[in-house]
């Protein structure tokens, strides 16, 4: 039995029979015939469409269709297209024009007689084609028609004519609507259906209607998933036999259809036809909506669906709808995971053959599609089409939401997701949803850890082939894209997209578009949460994570989760420590190629990004963007907690950690935690000590390149960041930012413990440690702990004596750059920071900040032990050591311990004698900057600190504070024992010792104990005789620098401190202050024994020794003891006979400066101290004090032996010697002894005959001043 044919299942009607059928019966006939044909198609029997089916599909009557017209095979075949040519019966046949429906270009000479047909010529071009059909037809139906010299057999002449039309290419049939021509009536009919939208065949499943039943059948297979046609080679199944036929060509590799223009071959004629359009550029199919033209009608149909918004093809798995059935089939492969098309080169598999074809170009490198405008070649026509739009600027696809235009529909589709927020692709592992399937596929690899693309060099696996390709370049250094102009090869190659604004070029047009937004400021992507806009959708996507806090990317090693896959990938390298990207200059390796590229700019100095505002250039575009915000003042990122705004989102994120207190990054070395991984990375360098960035000027090395760049500005003096308020310039932007707070006064960082607010987060962090007392950084040398690593590093220099910072002016070196900066201000005299209250200027902002406290009086730092408050934390820290007795800083020379390093530094100068601070006015040198600063005021006479009560001005704030207490009589420090109040805590501390009698400071030499360490130190010098401070004028040595300074004033005669009351001048401000108390009459220090009051506590202490009889200071020469060290010093001169104080008037020399001062008054007759009772004047205040007793008759000093009272302690002391018989002062000439040194002095004159006191009136000379004074009264008439 032969094969089943369409004729076996077809029914024929004559005209009479057809007219007997009603409309329903005629429709039934049509449906049955079409259904029978579809079944044959489904079984693979019908290889082509009979004319009957064509007419029935077109709705035409078939009553005169004859039997031979219902067969599905012709005796004649054109092997060029493997298309049978159907014979027809009569020349008058109404269907004579409907014969050859698909192809137009076979010549008659290409026809041949199929097997069993003896009277038909063979087609001489394609001899192999006829064997592909199995069906046969009897030769009795043949009839020969001659055409020229060819014997081509047709059933009708019309068939021959129609076949000839195909070879000639003539198109006689024209569409009046679109002015398009066709060679066949069937083609014209098909064309008409496109714009009339005849859709007779409806799908019951999806409701969609089609023009042709075959299309409906194909569509239904999308719903059922039915694929009855299977490939024997690879097992892949297809829904249509024709698709299987096309598919088979893949395995054979046969490409019989060649393009005459470029020589490229194809395995299907349809593909060749499409290809030819590239050369002709013909686009006859135009869209009525937007005017866009297409080369294929199918593309036009697909395009129209864009305007209609129609998406009839729905996926049962996820519900997503598509406008084309082919897209739905491709989509289904996502769910099935099916990838039957494998690349023989690299083994990669694909879901579609077209994708495999595109992929193969990667291996061949072929680029057949060339742009006529710029000559650029591409691998695929779609890329060329996309490229051409760059030149035309065409963007036909408009977004209805925002009006934005796009060059491709696919880009529009992706863009629309932004507005809808639709994320149909969901991850089954973690539930995360994506806008596009490609994103989901990439995401899945996170969970699977799949890395199918292996590097043959190092074995490393990658999740994407593109990443593997990039990776390979590391090993081979391959640069496949070579420029014909300059022979230079690069990895990325050509950058044809140039910005007209700034000239920057890009590889891709998308990059250029994004770049242009920098100039236009366009930010089309808006965040619905906070309203912030972004220039790219990807940045918006990343931004959204800030609001959701979602972290779907988890590290399998340590469990840490991240917001973005890129961050996870970067994090994973921490565990692997892989750094494949190496710098050829310095050998440093990096885990990302982008970081290597940025790193290389350190060596090249390249800064391609320029700021148009100030001309400053940057190595990174991100840095330029951040910099621009400085000019714009834009701070779009706001903190919801405190309202503070920031220029960068990263800064906001860092800021948020302040409120949250979150510190997830922990250091394995020391356990310290950090809020950011980058800070942890920087911290780790402390433990490794690695410093790869070296300064070529001074050789100093740094941990980070940014620090090196900042350091270089020290040498260059570059200060690119300028303050608009005051014009001051800074070397770094961060310092400028901090500086600006000075002008605004803003303090956004608040302490939750005590409520104190700060300008900077760093200050708050430092402040918090006061409450926690946390000190994680410990010194290995001495065990001292610190709350900041920076302080520990500075502290270590004490032990190493490292001083890397050198002053170019004077050569002095410093351990800290801040100290060097402060020191430089001495040479420059620069004081840019001015106090608004009093106008005083300072060289550092920190000093100005400290100074301001004087005006506010604020004391936020309180001691928990005693309740005392301080203005600065450093003072509190220093104070605390009083309670602990801690003295960690030891002097290597003498072993003495100090509570602060600064005090140790000052102390060390005693041993070295170094005096680096020199006064330009008088040439005087000083060991310390503070003393030097005070000295300068001597010349300038500047007094910035003014008392509001009396208008008096002072040079230092401490003196003003002390002075103010005179007006307020403020004595806040009360002692509970006696109720007495004191103006300062230090005086209270000293006072307490009186009640406790405590003397903790003991001399190891003689066992004597003292109340204060300073007294013990003074005392020790008695035993050691240490006098390290020597006078260059007279070689006299002193135990203390203050004594030497006082002594020098003797030689210089310098007395810059003058009393405004009486005009008296003093060498020292302390002496002037003491003197002023004389005028004020202020005597706050009262003796509890006798009620006597004193100006100074030291005077009271000396006075008390009268009552106690204490004389701690002993003369080693004669054994005599004294109540004060100063009296002992004076006494020692008796034994040495030294008289360093010489009178310039008469040449007389004295042992003490006080005696010289008293002597000088003889020449001037100056008596500034007047008695208010009698008006008498005196040369010294002490004499006035003694004189006053005459008027009061007061006798405070009583002898315990006999009860006799005296006005002065000296008289009492003299009196006591009557009872004791003590006469310690012996005359070396005659051996006579005296009870007082003054009597001995007077006695000595007998032996010398010296008479220094001469009367100017009569010329008489006297040995003693008292006798001389009495003699003067003879001439004046004054009563003796």
Swiss-Prot record:
Tissue-wise expression: Ubiquitous.
GO MF, any single term: DNA binding
Classification via CDD domains: KRAB_A-box
Domain of life of the native organism: Eukaryota
Biological process according to GO: regulation of transcription by RNA polymerase II
Family as reported in the entry's similarity comment: Belongs to the krueppel C2H2-type zinc-finger protein family.
Functional note: May be involved in transcriptional regulation.
Protein name: Zinc finger protein 208
Organism: Homo sapiens (Human)
């Amino acid at each position: 039995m032969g094969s089943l044919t369409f004729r076996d299942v077809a029914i024929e009607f004559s005209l009479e029979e057809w007219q007997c059928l009603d409309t329903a019966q005629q429709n039934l006939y049509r449906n049955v015939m079409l259904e029978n044909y579809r079944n044959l198609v489904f079984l693979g029997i019908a290889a082509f469409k009979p004319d009957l089916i064509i007419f029935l599909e077109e709705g035409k009557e078939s009553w005169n269709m004859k039997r031979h017209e219902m067969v599905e095979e012709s005796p004649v075949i054109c092997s060029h297209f493997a298309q049978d040519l159907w014979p027809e019966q009569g020349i008058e046949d109404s269907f004579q024009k409907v014969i050859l429906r698909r192809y137009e270009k076979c010549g008659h000479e290409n026809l041949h007689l199929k097997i069993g047909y003896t009277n038909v010529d063979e087609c001489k071009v394609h001899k192999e084609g006829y064997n592909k059909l199995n069906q046969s037809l009897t030769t009795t139906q043949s009839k020969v028609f001659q055409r020229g010299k060819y014997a081509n057999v047709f059933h009708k002449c019309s068939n021959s004519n129609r076949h000839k039309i195909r070879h000639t290419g003539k198109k006689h049939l024209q569409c009046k609507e679109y002015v398009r021509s066709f060679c066949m009536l069937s083609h014209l009919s098909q064309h008409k259906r496109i714009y009339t939208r005849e859709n007779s065949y409806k799908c019951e499943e999806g409701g969609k209607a089609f023009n042709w039943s075959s299309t409906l059948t194909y569509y239904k297979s999308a719903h059922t998933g039915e694929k009855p046609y299977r490939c024997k080679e690879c097992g892949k199944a297809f829904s249509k036999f024709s698709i299987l036929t096309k598919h088979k060509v893949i395995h054979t590799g046969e490409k019989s259809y060649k393009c005459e223009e470029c020589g490229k071959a194809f395995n299907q004629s349809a593909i060749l036809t499409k290809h030819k359009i590239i050369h002709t550029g013909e686009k006859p199919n135009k869209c009525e909506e937007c005017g866009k033209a297409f080369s294929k009608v199918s593309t036009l149909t697909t395009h129209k669906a864009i305007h209609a918004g129609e998406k009839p093809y729905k996926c049962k798995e996820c519900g997503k709808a598509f406008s084309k059935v082919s897209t739905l089939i491709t989509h289904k492969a996502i769910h099935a995971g099916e990838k039957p098309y494998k690349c023989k080169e690299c083994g990669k598999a694909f879901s579609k053959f077209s994708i495999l074809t595109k992929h193969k170009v990667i291996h061949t490198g072929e680029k057949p599609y060339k742009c006529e405008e710029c000559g650029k070649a591409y691998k695929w026509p779609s890329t060329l089409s996309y490229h051409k739009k760059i030149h035309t600027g065409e963007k036909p696809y408009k977004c209805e939401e925002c009006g934005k235009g796009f060059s491709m529909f696919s880009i529009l589709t992706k863009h629309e997701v932004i507005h809808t927020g639709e994320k149909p692709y969901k991850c089954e592992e973690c539930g995360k949803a994506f806008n596009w399937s490609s994103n989901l596929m990439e995401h899945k690899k996170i969970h699977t850890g799949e890395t199918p693309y292996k590097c043959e060099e190092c074995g490393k696996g990658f999740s994407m082939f593109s990443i593997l390709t990039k990776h390979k370049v590391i090993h081979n250094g391959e640069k496949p894209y070579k420029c014909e102009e300059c022979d230079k090869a690069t990895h990325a190659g050509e950058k044809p997209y140039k910005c007209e604004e700034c000239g920057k070029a890009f590889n891709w047009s998308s990059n250029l578009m994004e770049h242009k937004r920098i100039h236009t400021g366009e930010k089309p992507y808006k965040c619905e949460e906070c309203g912030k806009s972004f220039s790219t959708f990807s940045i918006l996507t990343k931004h959204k994570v800030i609001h959701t806090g979602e972290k779907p990317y988890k590290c399998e090693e340590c469990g840490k989760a991240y917001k973005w896959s890129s961050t996870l990938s970067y994090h994973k390298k921490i565990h692997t420590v892989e750094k494949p990207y190496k710098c050829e200059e310095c050998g440093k390796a990096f885990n990302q190629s982008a970081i290597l590229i940025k790193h290389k700019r350190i060596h090249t100095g390249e800064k391609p990004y320029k700021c148009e505002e100030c001309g400053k250039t940057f190595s990174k575009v991100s840095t330029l963007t951040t910099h621009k915000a400085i000019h714009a003042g834009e701070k779009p990122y706001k903190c919801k907690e405190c309202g503070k705004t920031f220029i960068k989102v990263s800064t906001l994120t860092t800021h948020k950690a302040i409120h949250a207190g979150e510190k997830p990054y922990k250091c394995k070395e020391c356990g310290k935690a950090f809020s950011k991984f980058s800070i942890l990375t920087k911290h780790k360098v402390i433990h490794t000590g690695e410093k790869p960035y070296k300064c070529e000027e001074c050789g100093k090395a740094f941990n980070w390149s940014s620090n090196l760049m900042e350091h270089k500005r020290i040498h260059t003096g570059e200060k690119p960041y300028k303050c608009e308020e005051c014009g001051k310039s800074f070397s770094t932007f961060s310092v400028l930012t901090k500086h600006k707070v000075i002008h605004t006064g803003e303090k956004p960082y608040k302490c939750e413990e005590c409520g104190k607010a700060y300008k900077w987060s760093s200050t708050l962090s430092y402040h918090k440690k006061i409450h926690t007392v946390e000190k994680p950084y410990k010194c290995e040398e001495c065990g001292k702990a610190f709350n900041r690593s920076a302080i520990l590093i500075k502290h270590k220099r004490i032990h190493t004596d490292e001083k890397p910072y050198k002053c170019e002016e004077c050569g002095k070196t410093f351990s800290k750059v801040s100290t060097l900066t402060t020191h430089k201000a001495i040479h420059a005299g620069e004081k840019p920071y001015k106090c608004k209250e009093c106008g005083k200027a300072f060289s550092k902002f920190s000093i100005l900040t400290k100074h301001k406290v004087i005006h506010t009086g604020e004391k936020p730092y309180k001691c928990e032990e005693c309740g005392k408050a301080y203005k600065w934390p450093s003072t509190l820290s220093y104070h605390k050591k009083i309670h602990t007795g801690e003295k960690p800083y030891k002097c290597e020379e003498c072993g003495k311990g100090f509570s602060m390093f600064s005090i140790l530094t000052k102390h060390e100068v005693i041993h070295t004698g170094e005096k680096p601070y020199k006064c330009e006015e008088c040439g005087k040198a000083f060991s310390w900057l503070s003393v030097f600063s005070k000295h300068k005021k001597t010349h300038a006479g500047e007094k910035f600190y003014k008392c509001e009560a009396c208008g008096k001005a002072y040079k230092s704030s401490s003196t003003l504070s002390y002075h103010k207490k005179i007006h307020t009589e403020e004595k806040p420090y009360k002692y509970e024992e006696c109720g007495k109040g004191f103006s300062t805590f230090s005086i209270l501390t000293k006072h307490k010792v009186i009640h406790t009698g405590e003397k903790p400071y003991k001399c190891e030499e003689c066992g004597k104990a003292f109340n204060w360490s300073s007294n013990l130190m003074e005392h020790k010098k008695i035993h050691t005789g240490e006098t390290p401070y020597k006078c260059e004028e007279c070689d006299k040595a002193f135990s203390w620098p203050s004594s030497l300074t006082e002594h020098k004033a003797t030689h210089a005669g310098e007395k810059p401190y003058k009393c405004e009351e009486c005009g008296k001048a003093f060498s020292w401000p302390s002496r002037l202050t003491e003197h002023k108390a004389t005028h004020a009459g202020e005597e706050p220090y009262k003796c509890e024994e006798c009620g006597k009051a004193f100006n100074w506590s030291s005077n009271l202490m000396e006075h008390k020794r009268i009552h106690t009889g204490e004389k701690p200071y002993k003369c080693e020469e004669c054994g005599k003891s004294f109540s004060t060290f100063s009296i002992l010093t004076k006494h020692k001169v008796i034994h040495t006979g030294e008289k360093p104080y010489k009178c310039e008037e008469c040449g007389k020399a004295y042992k003490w400066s006080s005696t010289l001062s008293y002597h000088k008054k003889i020449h001037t007759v100056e008596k500034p101290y007047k008695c208010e009772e009698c008006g008498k004047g005196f040369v010294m205040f002490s004499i006035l004090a003694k004189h006053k007793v005459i008027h009061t008759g007061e006798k405070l000093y009583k002898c315990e032996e006999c009860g006799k009272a005296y006005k002065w302690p000296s008289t009492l002391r003299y009196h006591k010697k009557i009872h004791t018989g003590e006469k310690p002062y012996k005359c070396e000439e005659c051996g006579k002894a005296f009870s007082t040194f003054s009597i001995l002095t007077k006695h000595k004159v007998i032996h010398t005959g010296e008479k220094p006191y001469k009367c100017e009136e009569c010329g008489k000379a006297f040995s003693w001043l008292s006798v001389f004074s009495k003699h003067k009264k003879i001439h004046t008439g004054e009563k003796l």
